[in-house]
Curated annotation (Swiss-Prot):
Involved in the biosynthesis of cyclooctatin, a potent inhibitor of lysophospholipase. This is Cyclooctatin synthase. SUPFAM superfamilies: Cytochrome P450. Gene3D superfamilies: Cytochrome P450 (1.10.630.10). Disulfide bonds: none annotated. Heme binds at residue 408. It comes from Streptomyces melanosporofaciens. Its cofactor is heme. The keyword Heme applies. Belongs to the cytochrome P450 family. InterPro entries: Cyt_P450, Cyt_P450_CS, Cyt_P450_E_grp-IV, Cyt_P450_sf, Cytochrome_P450_Monoox. Its EC number is 1.14.99.62. PROSITE patterns: CYTOCHROME_P450. Pfam families: p450. The gene is cotB4.
Amino acid sequence: MKDFFRMRTAQQPATRHWRHTVAPGGLPLAGHALLMARKPLQFLASLPAHGDLVELRLGPRPVYLPCHPELVQQVLVNARVYDTGGPVKEKAKPILGNGLITSDWADHRRQRRLVQPAFHTARIAKYAEVMERECEAESTAWTARRPIDVSHEMLALTARVTARALFSTDMAPHAVAEIQHCLPIVVEGAYRQAIDPTGLLAKLPLAANRRFDDALARLNQLIDRMIDDYKASDDGDRGDVLSALFAAQDDETGGTMSDQEIHDQVMTLLLAGIETTASALTWAWFLLGRNPGAEAALHAEVDEVLGGRAPRYADVPRLAYTQRVFSEALRLFPPAWLFTRTTTETTELGGRRLPPASDVLISPYVLHRDPALFPRPDSFDPDRWLPERAKEVTRGSYLPFGGGSRKCIGDVFGMTEATLALAAIAGRWRMRPIPGTKIRPRPQMSLTAGPLRMIPEPR
């Protein structure tokens, strides 16, 4: 599967004249904040036509959007100079703690070394046993020709998979239900706080704030209970993520993680690993419903590889078209559609001098929809990821999992989970769109689809 992500480094000239400009449409005082609030995807996708590095104003503060993949790579591979930071990070820390997403550069390196063993290939194979069972359960639970909300079903599936991979396969059903209930509330509330420039919204006595506070407290309590239960048991390595985190030892320092550090990593993995995969799976079903040729190719591969049985981890390498379907859904609707970096020192990007504490926006959505990088960028074409075509994709232009040292640590986990889910469901059902159903991307913490009603028809 890793071969799928190997892409050719585009040949670039030794010197380049970069185009940098200020984005059009800014207003006095507000700058481009209203455009970002009202139509962020359309606005951002229009910017590559104006320059390789585009300056925006969010209120009085300038932020910089690199639109060329070479500049994006420059940011992502230099994590010391372009660190996490800015107001979004500061608002996320009380929710996520000091985990992989929110930690500063120096500490992130240590954390990455400690968490990485939990996602080694041998452990992915163990987690895949959970994926297999849950995907099979999901695919057999539906009633023929009874409409379902695909978004809801995919979120429930990925919540069960992630929770049981984190905390072991015998996790109590009520704990999984607690995660399914609390997680969407926390994600929505975190997004509201992140986009509030004043910081006042979270302090108002609103019902939404009370729901958020309650859901966050319940998630924190659940994680603490799971940690306490593990410490009180004599189970040793149960094959789950929590066991790996407790066993982790830094090769460089010999250090381990405290209970609080493990808590923060678990919270990070819950919030980063459930909604993102669920959103991408929802988009995949939406796209397949609109492209019967791709749906037929998916069914043909599943029938050939599986022969009517449920998919297994060993089948994943042979489900090549299934992987291409998901990768193309990730290109068109990347869950991590926007993230930020902040400079730690004076540096230069695209010929522009950036002082310390300059905010840089990275948008995979912008790159993925750029016709200069992807021909017919708005078309759903899974075969653009055939090996002979994928090798022509410019390095740094496809970033569904980010890049550099902060690339998503669960990328292989997510691809494996999605491949098994698509194969399990496609082996039993044709997912039919309901006529008149309209859906549009919702750019929040991830690029969600909102409710998507479809009709499962037996194959």
